[in-house]
Design a protein with these regions (language model features):
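A conserved acidic beta->alpha catalytic loop
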Residues: 44-52, 99
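Short beta-strand/loop segment that forms part of the nucleotide-sugar
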Residues: 10, 23, 34-46, 68-69
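Acidic helix N-cap motif at the loop->helix transition within catalytic regions
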Residues: 17-21, 49-58
Length: 133
């Protein structure tokens, strides 16, 4: 039986310091979730630091890592849209590389989709509780 795939879309702008930490955490979570396959789709949004170089290295080491690189900065929404257009997973999550939201939440969100029967799940971090959207 074919495993379902989760695509993790990660818009990136000048994330050279965050990427190694984020990748380590998301890779750890993916190994814990043996029932699923993963795709890590990073979107480099015209970064001026070593973000693109790090993404190239990660994609050579891990065939689950793919990246798109913009020649200039289009903003986070442009990166999210490009990621959504290119994701190949059965499920999609958008995460920030700075780990504002912990990658471990992927397990909870996947459980809620599969076991609770939701069509869509979202995360609201404790630091955002009380904000009016």
């Amino acid at each position: 039986m074919k495993k379902e795939k989760i695509s993790i879309i990660v818009p990136c702008y000048n994330e050279e310091e965050s990427l190694p930490i984020f990748y380590k955490e998301i890779n750890k979570i993916s190994k814990e979730m043996k029932e699923t396959d993963f795709e890590f789709l990073f979107v480099n949004d015209g970064s001026k630091d070593k973000t693109l170089s790090i993404l190239r290295d990660l994609s050579k080491k891990d065939d689950r890592v793919r990246f798109i690189s913009f020649s200039r900065n289009f903003g986070k929404e442009g990166g999210m849209y490009a990621g959504l257009e290119n994701a190949t997973g059965d499920y999609v999550a958008i995460m920030d590389a700075d780990m504002q939201d912990p990658p471990s939440m992927i397990k909870t969100m996947y459980h809620d989709i599969k076991e609770e029967g939701y069509d869509c799940v979202a995360l609201c971090s404790p630091q955002h509780v009380g904000y009016n959207f």
